Amino acid sequence: MKIKGKVWKFGDNIDTDAIIPARYLNTSDPKELAKHVMEDADSSFPSKVKPGDIIIAGRNFGCGSSREHAPIAIKASGIRAVIAKSYARIFFRNAFNIGLPIFEVPELIDETNEGDEVEIDMNSGQIINLTKGKKYNTKPIPPFMQELIKAGGLVEWTKKRLSMEDIK
């Protein structure tokens, strides 16, 4: 499975409150959350992000409070993947649980600019900055995790599995 998109670049320690500010946590509607995603980090982001875009960021992306709203807001905005130097552990789990692929590639972050086009091959773990012609390698996403992503997250994957069990 390949993902290709334009890069949005953010720095270190982007916490869950910067991803989706607490003042919007009175809803869990993904479309509403998407209207405010990353607005405290870049006020133009919600209106300019396009389906298929990719976020890259520095260290400790998704730190702060444990809220599933953060990866939900990112995914609902149309972002297809996040690449960072490192992640807060709880964000890492929450992202895969809702079907948002994330990757750790520290050297890519320093060598990629906002607006560059990047292609990610989840099977091989190869990421190419198409704008600069640079290739990077990371761990491929295991087949089971790719199943979760294709299904739309753990809940949707479980629903499919349970409905398949009902058929047997």
From Swiss-Prot:
Gene3D superfamilies named in the record: Aconitase, domain 4 (3.20.19.10)
EC supergroup of this enzyme: lyase
Catalytic activity reported: (2R,3S)-3-isopropylmalate = (2S)-2-isopropylmalate
Residue ranges the record marks as coiled coil: none
EC number(s) per entry: 4.2.1.33
GO MF annotation, one: 3-isopropylmalate dehydratase activity
GO BP terms in the entry: L-leucine biosynthetic process
Alphabetical UniProt keywords: Amino-acid biosynthesis, Branched-chain amino acid biosynthesis, Leucine biosynthesis, Lyase
Pathway(s) per entry: Amino-acid biosynthesis; L-leucine biosynthesis; L-leucine from 3-methyl-2-oxobutanoate: step 2/4
Keyword rRNA-binding set for record: no
S-S bonds: none
Protein role: Catalyzes the isomerization between 2-isopropylmalate and 3-isopropylmalate, via the formation of 2-isopropylmaleate.
PANTHER family, alphabetized: 3-ISOPROPYLMALATE DEHYDRATASE SMALL SUBUNIT 1, 3-ISOPROPYLMALATE DEHYDRATASE SMALL SUBUNIT 2-RELATED-RELATED
Entry similarity comment: Belongs to the LeuD family. LeuD type 2 subfamily.
Assembly behavior: Heterodimer of LeuC and LeuD.
HAMAP family tied to this protein: LeuD_type2
Name recorded for this polypeptide: 3-isopropylmalate dehydratase small subunit
Gene name of the record: leuD
